[in-house]
Amino acid sequence: MAATAQYLPRNNSLPSNPLMHPDSDRMHQGTTYREVQKMMHQEYLQGLATNAGHPMSLTHHQWLPNPTSDWGSGSHLGAQAEHGKSGVQSSREDLSSSFHHHRSHLVHQQTPSSHAWAQSGGHHLPSMSPGSNSHQPLIYSQSSYTNLNGMLGPQASSLHHSMRDPLHDDPGVHDTHVESPPQHLGHHQDHSDEDAPSSDDLEQFAKQFKQRRIKLGFTQADVGLALGTLYGNVFSQTTICRFEALQLSFKNMCKLKPLLNKWLEETDSTTGSPTNLDKIAAQGRKRKKRTSIEVGVKGALENHFLKCPKPSAHEITSLADSLQLEKEVVRVWFCNRRQKEKRMTPAGVPHPPMEDVYSQAETPPLHHTLQTSVQ
């Protein structure tokens, strides 16, 4: 029993290589193994007496050596051992040659390597005799499949199930089903690419749009506000300018193109009626007309500016009433006049006080004096 306990840990090393030759140095070390051989040989003789002619007992005990020799002295035992070695070697060669094939060949076709391995695995299963240890066959049978999965690589689990039932799963159909969605997705992508305009089409449309817009007499700001009134999307003058100059992104160009195309169609349909054109033009920015001031009115404003270049709000109101002008027009005129005076005065020349310069109406302004001195 002590020898059996010593043998069991060594038997745990068998799953690392179930096809290892019995003469390997890894399994034969020390005199303890010789004692185990003697004990196992005695069990073998008892097994022959109890299970005479049983194939599983013979195949199981073909690995047990004779105390006088390594492989036993019986003719039937030697022939069985030679047959086991040749079967193991042939299965090893067949298995190594089948590793280079595709995984689908191993699943769809029952190659000789799989049959040889199944047979060799069956020969290695020990007999379940009442006197033998029940834990040993479980460990040994599991190790053969464990090492098979390890030698076959990362896909060993699927291959192992396929060897038990070849019709369990069809990897070819599975691979086709997995690869089909990307093809379907690519079909939708091609369809969307066909709908999107090309860069040449966008460039040609931007050129035609600019020509037709100028011909119709609309500014870029008018087009942006008209799009907001007609379709609810207000665009700035900068956006329309960048579209015509092809400075927007391709995505924004594609979004803006159909809106501008609809606006052109709407404008072309109303070309014959000036009323509709006036409505579309009125959708643009409302800009005040430039006010033209008469010569006599401009002289009166100039005289008042010489007296007081920055009048108060009350003075502007009274001056606008006397000249029959709008209050805003008078205010803007004085602002522009002060800016003009500031531009015409050199920066290096000190600016005299306004009271001294404009104390007398007959005295010309400072810039007239400077121009006379320079001449």
UniProtKB/Swiss-Prot annotation:
Gene3D superfamilies: Homeodomain-like, lambda repressor-like DNA-binding domains. GO terms for molecular function: DNA-binding transcription factor activity, RNA polymerase II-specific; RNA polymerase II cis-regulatory region sequence-specific DNA binding. SMART domains: HOX, POU. Residues 107-117, 129-139, 151-160 have a biased composition (Polar residues). It comes from the Eukaryota. It is found in: Nucleus. GO terms for cellular component: nucleus. Residues 286-345 bind DNA. Coiled coil: none annotated. Keywords: Developmental protein, DNA-binding, Homeobox, Neurogenesis, Nucleus, Transcription, Transcription regulation. InterPro entries: HD (IPR001356), Homeobox_CS (IPR017970), Homeodomain-like_sf (IPR009057), Lambda_DNA-bd_dom_sf (IPR010982), POU (IPR013847), POU_dom (IPR000327), POU_domain_TF (IPR050255), TF_POU_3 (IPR016362). Residues 194-268 form the POU-specific domain. GO terms for biological process: brain development; regulation of transcription by RNA polymerase II. Residues 162-178 have a biased composition (Basic and acidic residues). Pfam families: Homeodomain, Pou. Residues 1-29, 56-139, 151-200 are annotated as: Disordered. Belongs to the POU transcription factor family. Class-3 subfamily. Acts as a transcription factor. May play a role in neuronal differentiation. This is POU domain, class 3, transcription factor 1-B. It comes from Xenopus laevis. The gene is pou3f1-b.
